[in-house]
């Protein structure tokens, strides 16, 4: 798929490594991703914000999920080599949340942060992506979605925590303090 770009925020002796990526249409500087990054950094974690290869190559859509997942696994493996023995937490926004969930078991992630997990295409609840959310097995997943998200909101029983921010659609306009407050205790739980 080609190279990715990684924006790395390091700390000495990190308690964990958060590897997080964007959605299909956004970037790693989205305010919700930055809220998670800041919380992770404050909790003693190193943070790798990943611009996926399709985006680096100029693509607008992620394309084939298998290729996207294989690329993600290579990225995480390279980061693990740089941070040996450090627990990995992975996350993403929208399409990136799907990738993080689908690959969590193979990565052996300590946990997953899923921002705006797109449960189904807008107006098509019969095309559920619940199986991707459940692909994490016993790995804890924290989902943060807007209450008005046209992509749906996962059921509370399908994740360790599902936080719904009222009056927010798929792209958050407010609630970044809620996002930070939601992820902070989970980072403490997943740290070494």
Task: Annotate each language-model stretch with its function.
Residues 1-87, 99:
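Serine-hydrolase catalytic machinery in alpha/beta-hydrolase-like enzymes
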Residues 136-137, 143-145:
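Short beta-strand/loop motif that positions the catalytic acidic residue
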Residues 146, 150-155:
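Conserved alpha/beta-hydrolase "acid-adjacent" motif
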Residues 66, 173-189:
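Post-His helix in hydrolase/transferase enzymes
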Residues 99-103, 123:
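Hydrolases whose catalytic domains are alpha/beta-hydrolase-1, hotdog thioesterase
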Residues 92-100:
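Gly/Ala-rich beta-loop-alpha elbow adjacent to hydrolase catalytic centers
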Residues 166-171:
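Histidine-bearing beta->alpha loop at or near hydrolase active sites
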């Amino acid at each position: 798929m080609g190279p990715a770009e990684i924006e790395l925020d390091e700390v000495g002796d990190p308690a964990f490594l958060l590897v997080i990526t964007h959605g299909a249409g956004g970037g790693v500087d989205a305010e919700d991703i930055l809220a998670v990054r800041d919380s992770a950094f404050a909790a003693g974690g190193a943070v790798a914000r990943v611009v996926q290869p399709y985006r680096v190559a100029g693509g607008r859509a992620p394309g084939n999920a298998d290729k996207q997942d294989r690329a993600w696994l290579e990225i995480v493996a390279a980061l693990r080599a740089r941070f040996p023995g450090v627990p990995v937490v992975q996350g993403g926004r929208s399409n990136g949340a799907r990738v993080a969930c689908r690959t969590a078991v193979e990565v052996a992630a300590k946990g997953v942060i899923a921002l705006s997990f797109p449960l189904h295409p807008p107006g098509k609840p019969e095309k559920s992506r619940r199986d991707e959310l459940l692909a994490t097995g016993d790995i804890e997943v924290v989902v943060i979605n807007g209450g008005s998200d046209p992509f749906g909101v996962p059921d509370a029983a399908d994740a360790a925590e599902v936080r719904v921010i009222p009056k927010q659609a798929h792209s958050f306009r407010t609630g970044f303090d809620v996002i930070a407050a939601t992820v902070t205790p989970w980072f403490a739980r997943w740290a070494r």
